[in-house]
Amino acid sequence: MLNIEQIKEIIPHRYPFLLVDKILEVDEGKRAVGIKNVSANEEFFNGHFPDYAVMPGVLIVEALAQVGAVAVLKKEENRGRLAFFAGIDNCRFKKQVRPGDQLRLEVEMTRVRGPIGKGKAIATVDGEVACEAEITFAIGDKKE
């Protein structure tokens, strides 16, 4: 299990864009399972929507990508590098995510070739699928 400080050592995201609270499981380079506790105090709820708060779907996908990044960047040869979003395929939103929900974020790498990889990503709330997608990423370095 990784806490928030350990996650911040692996991925560069910070508030308000760090969308993973803890990692429950990680199999380096293969898969990871994380948690996002969705609080009523999330900044995005101010505008999405003021009278009926719903977590934006793109942020659910971003949270999944961050969990996938932890899995990939935990691998020894990728440490200190960045995982860039390279694509989203077959994305479906099946359940609204509201304040008080706990998102379980699971990403399993299905294919990795060189610096490019694909993963199957599923976000659930109370065992119900909220979002599923295939995410593509590219491993790279910071450019000075």
UniProtKB/Swiss-Prot annotation:
One of its GO terms (cellular component) is membrane. It is found in: Cytoplasm. InterPro entries: FabA_FabZ, FabZ, HotDog_dom_sf. Its main location: cytoplasm. It catalyses: a (3R)-hydroxyacyl-[ACP] = a (2E)-enoyl-[ACP] + H2O. One of its GO terms (biological process) is lipid A biosynthetic process. Gene3D superfamilies: Hotdog Thioesterase (3.10.129.10). Its EC number is 4.2.1.59. Keywords: Cytoplasm, Lipid A biosynthesis, Lipid biosynthesis, Lipid metabolism, Lyase. It comes from the Bacteria. GO terms for molecular function: (3R)-hydroxyacyl-[acyl-carrier-protein] dehydratase activity. The active site is at residue 48. HAMAP family: FabZ. Belongs to the thioester dehydratase family. FabZ subfamily. Involved in unsaturated fatty acids biosynthesis. Catalyzes the dehydration of short chain beta-hydroxyacyl-ACPs and long chain saturated and unsaturated beta-hydroxyacyl-ACPs. This is 3-hydroxyacyl-[acyl-carrier-protein] dehydratase FabZ.
